[in-house]
Design a protein with these regions (language model features):
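Extended, charge-rich alpha-helical interface modules
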Residues: 1-67
Length: 67
């Protein structure tokens, strides 16, 4: 799980890549959970939270660049 400070230190291209990776990871984890193949529900939660952090920071940057 990444800290917001670590995410803020990433550049925009890295942030976009991180978002893509986390979306893929959450999708794969969701499929595995649906198939009953994973017992690690915390991994899914951590991935979703990291994705939320990335999206929040992207939104902050967009808002600050517009205003």
């Amino acid at each position: 799980s990444m800290r917001p400070k670590e995410i803020r230190e990433l550049g925009d291209p890295e942030l976009d890549q991180k978002e893509k990776d986390l979306r893929e990871e959450t999708f794969r984890l969701r499929l595995r959970m649906a198939a009953g193949q994973t017992e690690n529900k915390m991994a899914g939660r951590a991935a979703r939270r990291d994705l939320a952090r990335v999206l929040t920071i992207k939104a902050e940057r967009k808002a600050s660049s517009e205003g």
